[in-house]
Structure formats: structure tokens, C-alpha cells
Amino acid sequence: MKLRKLLSLSIAAILLCFTGCVNKNTLSKHEPITILAPYLECDRLVDLVHKKYPEINLKVLSYSGANTTTYLQNMLAADDLPDICTQTIYDPNIDDVSDRMIDLAGYDFTDNYVESRLQDISDDGAIYMLPSAYSCIGITYNKTLLEKHGWKLPKSFHDLEKLAKKAKKAGVQLCLTQIEYPGYGFQYMCNIADTAFLGTFQGKQWQKDYLTGKANVSDTKKMMDCMDYIQKWKDLGMFTANKKNPQSDDETIKEFMKGNTLFLLGSKNGIGETDGTKDKFGLMPYLSEDGSQNVYILNVTRFHGLSKKLEKDPQKLKDALKVMKVNSSVEGTSALYEEATLKANLLPFKDWNADNTYYGDIADEINAGNTAPLIYVGWENTLVNTGYRMLEYIQDKATIKDVVDQLDKDQDRVVNNKPEVITTTTEVISQKSCAKLIGRCFMEATKSDAALISLGKWIKGNGKEQNMAGVNGKLYAQDITESDICSILPTGWYDTIQTVQLSGREIKQLCKDGYDAAGTGNTYPYVLVKDKKLEADQTYKVVICGAGKELTLNDSGIVGMNAAKDFFSKFKTLSEADVK
């Protein structure tokens, strides 16, 4: 019996060892699952995934550049996608991604989402991208002021008209409107129209028709009815700029915080929590005339999906689906965001509790589907012009007809106008080559002797911003516009080029040490661009993108974007062979 027992134990031990070896080999055979989620807390997601699925190796790719939306859109267009894809904007009515992304509709983790949020991203029943955290835009109101006068929150525009009379009689201002940016004007117009025709199925079809040149505003009666409704808002007093400095959002909020204004049209939610006031505030929807189509406006900050290329590798697809399962939960999505961000946003899940957020009072309304998506994609070529015209209208410098005329006038630009092409890349220009080109560009612009351009990459422990001072990403084979250049440009849209005086020895040491952006000791490499051999004891004027605090910088005063446009426009076409 003892012999049998020992033999059984020995066999069990051998099997256990064998099983252990198989598991280790299996683990080692799991290819990394790549994810690119710019400016999110990916370290925490990696830790959470590893805790739940130790066999999965989640590899974070990095992008910390100045134009996230354009870069992610270019990746999508080129089908150069990580396994887990991210986009900042997505409209299934406009964006067809069925040939590049997996339909997730049949997977059980989609059941975690509120039905109304799935309807927002449904592509004829298919689901290619799932929403992450989102913000909600409505009309801020002063709860304390309403309670003080015994007034009820209006549930329709008709109610609002009655309340306006009471407010006027009591000496209370009805509304203040923020007008610092032209985008506000465009959104006010769309948000109000969403409570009428624009927010209906037919209205959504009209949007497609406008964007393709098949319909305009002035020839569409129901859209003209929307414009008439906007006029009613103005006549009632809902469009009122602050008198001290109309273009300052801060001044408008200060005026609102004095406590004698009922409503605020603007971009900021959560007013009152840190603004030094005892008044309490809430958020109400944009109101339809009879209250049957009131809407909050939703702006999803990130969408996530899976690359269709995963279908060629069953093991990777299996692992990627597990990551998506984690990401499609309150715990997983919460890991990606800071606490303050979570408090100011909503999550799209059935089991998410909104009580500790600014939206606690209205979460049920939002989940019930009383919402409309933020209108932006496709409208970029009229957004600023129409927005400005709306702001003029708010200030009595234009009429509602002027707004209509602007939309009709801009339609050709919306349908046909393309941004200026600066050069055309005939192949992918790698990140390192982009850094060399930027270095050469900035050297020429500042008449410098050399350039140190740091490279972005993901380093665990360096936070969600990683290296914003360097070159992030690459250029794809396409026509290159200002937006594309901005996506790789360390100085972004408006920043100026910085230089520093360094000896050849110091330059060599910096190349060895790298750029410590996060102060963790985990550094980003520099690409050194130079025209001549650098002598150790000689001092040089050096362009630097990614400078430690110990360096004394000199501001050239030259805007990096201007220099880059001049530099890249010299190339009719651009390839790796042009990189020196």
C-alpha cells in the first residue's frame, strides 16, 4: 500500500511538474495584445488585466502628441491599428469601419452597457466601437434660487416662458450665456434644434443630406421651423451675454455665481463645488416646446474596439476579447480615469452608480435615452463661421436669417473643400525619421548648430501624459495637411521653438541620459541632428524638444508650426529617402 501510495504521489508530482511546464510554455507563447489609449491611465488597466488574466501580456503603445484626434483617424484610415483600437470621435452614420474592425454585437460584455448608449453607436445592428466615459451638456440652473422663490424647474419651453415672467417680476435675471469660443454658438444652435426636427430620425437624415450637398437649411421647412424656435429662445432672454466682458467665460461665471441668475448656457458642469459659493446647482436638459423631446447632449471622450486583423490569430483574439471584457466594466473603465475626471463624467454601464457625480440627479433621464450626440464630425468647415454668426446673433449684431445664410453659404466648403496640402508622403515616415525632419526644420528656422529631439514611448510609471515635449507618432502615406503636421510636432499648434547653449560634452551626455519627463529616472531617448562634428569643449546653439529643469532655455519666438509648414512645403513629395 505504501509503495502504491508513493508511486501515486510520484506520478502526481511528475504530472504537476509537466503541467507547470506546459503552463509556462503556454504563457510564453501568448503574443502581446497591443493597446493605444492616449492620455488615459493605462498602467492601472494593465495591472487590472494582469490580475484577472495573468497569462495576458498587455503592451501599451504611446501617443502623447498635440493632435490626438487626427493621429488616431490617420491610423484608422491606414489600417495601422493596434489590437485594441481607440478613437476620440466616431459616428456610425458617417464612419464605415466594418472592413477594419470586429463586430462586437454578439459578445456578452456588450450586455453591460445601457441600451441607449448602444443605440448611439449601432451600425445597423453591428457594434464596432464601444463608448467609454462621456460628458453631458445641458443647462446649468441655480437650485438655491429656485427654492428661495418657490419656483419649479421647467419641464418644457412653455413652462420656461411662465417662469421667465415670474423671474422678471422678482428682479431675477433669467439666463447668462458664455460666448468666448465660436464653437459655443454652433452648439447652442444644434442643441436647441435637437429638441425639435434635428433630433428626429428625419432630422438625422437631413444632416446626412446637408453634408453631402443634397439639402440645405433655407429650403427645408422643418429646419427653418427650428431656426424660428431658436428665435423664441432669444426673445425670451435665454441668450444674454455678461455686460462687463462678454467674451470672457470666467466673467460670465462670476456674474452667475452672484446668485441672481437662474440659468447658465455654457460649457462647464459641476459649478459650485470649488467656486466659493453656498448655492447649489443642477443640470437640466435643453427644452422642447411641449417637453416631449427634451435632450441632454452627450460627448463621448473615447471609443474602443478590436482590429479585424485579430481574426487571423485565434489566440490573440481570445486574449483581446478578455481585455475588452475588463474594459467593458465599471472597474475596468474606472481604472483608465482619474477620480476627478470620473466625478465630472458618466459611465455607460447598467451597474454604474452616479450618486457621487455631478449627474446623480439626472442619470436615470440620461440612461432612458433623453439625449442627442454632440454634433461635430463632418461639420468642421462651417462650425467656426456659423458659430461666430450665432455669437453675433446673441449680441444683436446679426439676425437668425444671417445664421441660416451662413450655413447655406458654407455648404460647398463642407461638401467639397479640402484643407491645404503642404506635401504628400509616398510611404510611411517612421517616428525616428519624423524626429530628424523636425530637428532639421527647427535648426534651419533658428539658425542652430544642432537639435535634440526626444521621442515618445510608453514607460510604465511615467503617468498618462508620458512625453508631450517630443515627437510622437509617424506620418502615413497621404496628403499632409496642417493637422497632420501638428500630430507629430512637439510644439503643437502655437508653441515656439526653444534653444539652449550646450557644450559638445553636454550634448553627448544628454544623448546618453535621455529626457526625464516624469522625474522618475525612466527617460525618453533623444535623436541628435547635426551638420558637423561636435567638439567636446566648444559651445553650440541647440534646439531642444524635451528639456530638463536644470537647463536654461531661450525662447526663439518662432512658432514651430509656421517653421514646419515652410519646411515641409519645400517637398513636393516626401519619403524616407529625404530624411538625412
Identify what each model region corresponds to:
Residues 88-137, 152, 282-284:
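Hinge/lid segment of periplasmic solute-binding proteins
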Residues 41-42, 298, 340-343, 354, ...:
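C-terminal capping/gating helix-and-loop segments adjacent to ligand/active sites or protein-protein/ligand interfaces
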Residues 6-8, 21-93, 153, 292, ...:
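Conserved N-terminal structural module of periplasmic/extracytoplasmic solute-binding proteins
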Residues 83, 110-146, 174, 289-297, ...:
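A structural signal for short loop-to-beta-strand junctions that line the ligand-binding cleft
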Residues 51, 275-339:
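Extracytoplasmic/periplasmic substrate-recognition and gating elements
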Residues 128, 161-215:
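Extracytoplasmic/periplasmic solute-binding protein
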Residues 416-580:
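Catalytic centers of hydrolytic enzymes
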